[in-house]
Amino acid sequence: MSQVQSGILPEHCRAAIWIEANVKGEVDDLRAASKTFADKLATFEAKFPDAHLGAVVAFGNNTWRALSGGVGAEELKDFPGYGKGLAPTTQFDVLIHILSLRHDVNFSVAQAAMEAFGDCIEVKEEIHGFRWVEERDLSGFVDGTENPAGEETRREVAVIKDGVDAGGSYVFVQRWEHNLKQLNRMSVHDQEMMIGRTKEDNEEIDGDERPETSHLTRVDLKEDGKGLKIVRQSLPYGTASGTHGLYFCAYCARLHNIEQQLLSMFGDTDGKRDAMLRFTKPVTGGYYFAPSLDKLMAL
C-alpha cells in the first residue's frame, strides 16, 4: 500500500504553516528539492516524536502535469473561482503544509523547507495557523464538527485507494478574512441561524428550523444518499490588531466533493449563497494534488 504524506490524516493539531509558491527554476530542481525536503522532514519527525509532526508537498495543475508527464490526478485543475468573483482564484504552483502540536517545530521545518527548495520557488503567501479555545473559529463557533474522526475513516475520505494515484489526495486551500465587528453587531440567535448550530454548546439546529442559506445547509450535501465528506485541516490565523480569520484547508480522494460544496456556498447551484458571507470573505483559493510519499520520492 502506498504511503500517505504525513500531514493529511492527523487530528487536533495545535499549529500549522501553509506556504504557497510559484516555480522559478527547472522542474528537475523541483523534483530534487521535494525529495530533499522529505528527507529533512523524516529527520524532524524522528527528533520530535511527541510533536506529532506531519507535512505535505502538493502541486498545482500545470506543475503536476510537468512533474508526472501528464499521468494521474485526472480531476486536478486550476482553481477557477466561484460566485462571480465572491471566491477569487489565486492559484499557485506549489503548496507546503506543515502541522503539529508545536509551533516551534513547525517553524523549524518551514525553515528546512526554504533551505530545500531554495531558489527554485518564489513564496507568494505564508500563513501561520493556531488552534483556538475549544477548537473554535474566531467567530466563537466550534469549527469542523462533522470532520471525519479516526485514522481509518479519515483515510477512507481523504486518500485515493488504488490506481496510479493510490495514496494521493486532492487539496484545497482558501484563506478567509473575518469582520468580527460586523459579526458582533448580530444577535446570537441571528449568528446561530447563519451557521446552523448553537454557539455555546454546538448543537445542530434542525434542518426545517434553519434557513436554506445557513452554512451547515450549504455544505451538508449528499449524492445518492451518501454524504460528500472531506477531511479538514483548517485553523484560525492572524493578529489581534489586524487581519484575522480562518485558513480553510481540505483533503479529499475526490476533488468533486470539495467543488460541490463550493458551488453550493457561492450560489452557483441554486442562486443561494452561504449566509456567513455576511461577516467573512475568502481572499485566496487554490487546488493542488498531493501524491503519495512513494511517488513524491520517485518523481
Model-assigned labels for residue ranges:
Residues 1-299:
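Long, histidine/aromatic-enriched segments associated with O2/redox biology
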